[in-house]
């Protein structure tokens, strides 16, 4: 193979450089304008497809799909699109198909966006652990989200307001070795420990 300067390009004469003025090269580098609607948009993943119904002001015979990423949306706050939302956009041809460059509402206004929001991972994790509100004891929220006024402090073990967990009589009645273990394990421990004790003779 020769060096880059010695290679010939298709359609060029020897010693002549290909010009970038060809209609094909110009068409690929220039952004194209289109309009249509949002076909679908995944708010959790942040991408979707637009259904282009007009290109450069001329109506198309059949809609054409154009990829859209949330980073290309012209709007404030959480960026997403609502299914069926009217949009105008600039786009380019890529190796994967058509991709949007900038997406706006009709006339260049902000996009409306979807009302849906992805569920927070931290919210899902803390709910699955069975955490509860320290104020009212409810399972569906935490104290900072509690709608009730501050409640009197109470024992986390027996829920009494007369003492705290450190002075709980119900917790003190449990043997120190079995605290925090379910009853099933305590029974097994008792069975094993009595079987291991040697018999005393009198």
From Swiss-Prot:
Listed under GO cellular component are:
cytoplasm; cytoplasmic stress granule; nucleolus; nucleus; P-body; rough endoplasmic reticulum
Q: What function does this protein fulfil?
A: RNA-binding protein that inhibits processing of pre-let-7 miRNAs and regulates translation of mRNAs that control developmental timing, pluripotency and metabolism. Seems to recognize a common structural G-quartet (G4) feature in its miRNA and mRNA targets. 'Translational enhancer' that drives specific mRNAs to polysomes and increases the efficiency of protein synthesis. Its association with the translational machinery and target mRNAs results in an increased number of initiation events per molecule of mRNA and, indirectly, in mRNA stabilization.
Give the CDD domains listed for this entry.
CSP_CDS
**Originating gene:** LIN28A
Residue ranges, annotated region (Disordered): 1-31, 169-202
Concerning its family, UniProt says:
Belongs to the lin-28 family.
Domain note for this entry? The CCHC zinc fingers interact with the GGAG motif at the 3' end of let-7 miRNAs precursors, more generally they bind the 5'-NGNNG-3' consensus motif with micromolar affinity. The CSD domain recognizes the loop at the 5' end. The flexible linker allows accommodating variable sequences and lengths among let-7 family members.
Binding residue positions for Zn(2+) 1:
133, 136, 141, 146
Give the keywords, sorted.
Cytoplasm, Endoplasmic reticulum, Metal-binding, Nucleus, Repeat, RNA-binding, RNA-mediated gene silencing, Zinc, Zinc-finger
**Span of zinc fingers (CCHC-type):** 131-148, 153-170
Q: Where is this region: Flexible linker?
A: 107-130
Please name the InterPro entries in this protein's record.
CSD, CSP_DNA-bd, Lin-28_RNA-binding, Lin-28A-like_Znf-CCHC_2, NA-bd_OB-fold, Znf_CCHC, Znf_CCHC_sf
Coiled-coil parts of chain: none
Subunit comment: Monomer.
The name on file for this protein is Protein lin-28 homolog A
Q: Where in the cell is it found?
A: Cytoplasm; Rough endoplasmic reticulum; Cytoplasm, P-body; Cytoplasm, Stress granule
Species this chain originates from: Gallus gallus
A GO BP entry is: pre-miRNA processing
The UniProt record lists the CSD domain at 33-106
Keyword rRNA-binding listed? The answer is: no
- Entry annotated with the keyword Metal-binding: yes
């Amino acid at each position: 193979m020769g060096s880059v300067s010695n290679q010939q390009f298709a359609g060029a004469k020897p010693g002549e450089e290909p010009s970038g003025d060809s209609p094909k090269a110009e068409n690929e580098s220039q952004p194209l304008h289109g309009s249509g609607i949002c076909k679908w948009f995944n708010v959790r993943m942040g991408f979707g497809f637009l259904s282009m119904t007009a290109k450069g002001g001329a109506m198309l015979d059949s809609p054409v799909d154009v990829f859209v990423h949330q980073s290309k949306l012209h709007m404030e706050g959480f960026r997403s699109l609502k299914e069926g939302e009217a949009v105008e956009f600039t786009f380019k041809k890529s190796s994967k198909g058509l991709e949007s460059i900038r997406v706006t509402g009709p006339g260049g206004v902000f996009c409306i966006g979807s009302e849906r929001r992805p569920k927070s991972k931290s919210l899902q994790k803390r709910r699955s652990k069975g955490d509860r509100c320290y104020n009212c004891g409810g399972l569906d929220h935490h104290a900072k989200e509690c709608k009730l006024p501050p409640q009197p402090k109470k024992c986390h073990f027996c829920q009494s307001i007369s003492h705290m967990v450190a002075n709980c009589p119900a917790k003190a009645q449990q043997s120190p070795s079995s605290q925090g273990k379910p009853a099933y394990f305590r029974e097994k421990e008792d069975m094993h420990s009595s079987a291991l004790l040697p018999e005393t003779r009198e």
